[in-house]
Amino acid sequence: MLSKRIIPCLDVKDGVVVKGVQFRNHEVMGGIVELARRYAEEGADELVFYDITASSDARVVDKSWVSRVAEVIDIPFCVAGGIKSVEDARQILEFGADKVSINSPALADPGLITRLAERFGVQCVVVGIDSYFDADTGHYQVKQFTGDESRTRTTAWHTLDWVQEAQKRGAGEIVLNVMNQDGMRQGYDLEQLKLVRAVCKVPLIASGGAGAMEHFRDAFTLADVDGALAASVFHKGLIPIPELKRWLKNEGVAIRE
């Protein structure tokens, strides 16, 4: 059995790590390189960096900090933010990232997923999906440009349809960012994760809502996700990664210590 992954998420804005609640009201959490080093030392399996305003600002992630992160950590890391071309991705991978993640640019140009997969291999291509449950319609909708509240828009895609389309085009991994739960610390959206898991044949990463060790366990055991991504509980020291991993192992979850 493959080990489940614990993945701190670092949202980057204006050169520092920030965290919001439901993608709004961001507060500064610390320096990019300092937090990356800390999480690697604490035993994180992987890191994900989102330059959250790159797509809405029509620019590419700042590559200067990518190379600095690569110099100080020895675990895989993924970078996202305004990657719109093979060349954008090539530069980020050359600066030391192990994977690139695309979200809004893939919605604008789904063929980008295929071009990246053909050039770098599916193992390097992650598709992030910002999913919002619309209580009025009862549908899970995909949102775009979520890094800037004023520019966020609802796309025509239902989440399950976009998950399947992204895989068909070459996504090697899906990160499901559940907007309703983001920063609330009330648990992952297990119902939605189970629905996505049923149609997702590539590794699936849960994101949005972790607030207790039980939430990680439930995502792994009840929704069968491959990795669990979290931010505020790690940034604020509410759940130490070494303790989390020991606890999960005692709960029978296959985890790297």
From Swiss-Prot:
The active site is at D11, D130. It is an enzyme of class 4 (lyase). It is found in: Cytoplasm. Pfam families: His_biosynth. InterPro entries: Aldolase_TIM (IPR013785), His_biosynth (IPR006062), HisF (IPR004651), IGPS_HisA/HisF (IPR050064), RibuloseP-bd_barrel (IPR011060). Its main location: cytoplasm. It catalyses: 5-[(5-phospho-1-deoxy-D-ribulos-1-ylimino)methylamino]-1-(5-phospho-beta-D-ribosyl)imidazole-4-carboxamide + L-glutamine = D-erythro-1-(imidazol-4-yl)glycerol 3-phosphate + 5-amino-1-(5-phospho-beta-D-ribosyl)imidazole-4-carboxamide + L-glutamate + H(+). Its EC number is 4.3.2.10. GO terms for biological process: L-histidine biosynthetic process. The keyword Lyase applies. The keyword Thylakoid does not apply. GO terms for molecular function: imidazoleglycerol-phosphate synthase activity; lyase activity. Keywords: Amino-acid biosynthesis, Cytoplasm, Histidine biosynthesis, Lyase. Pathway: Amino-acid biosynthesis; L-histidine biosynthesis; L-histidine from 5-phospho-alpha-D-ribose 1-diphosphate: step 5/9. It comes from the Bacteria. GO terms for cellular component: cytoplasm. IGPS catalyzes the conversion of PRFAR and glutamine to IGP, AICAR and glutamate. The HisF subunit catalyzes the cyclization activity that produces IGP and AICAR from PRFAR using the ammonia provided by the HisH subunit. PANTHER family: IMIDAZOLE GLYCEROL PHOSPHATE SYNTHASE HISHF, IMIDAZOLE GLYCEROL PHOSPHATE SYNTHASE SUBUNIT HISF/H IGP SYNTHASE SUBUNIT HISF/H. Heterodimer of HisH and HisF. Belongs to the HisA/HisF family. This is Imidazole glycerol phosphate synthase subunit HisF. It comes from Aeromonas salmonicida (strain A449).
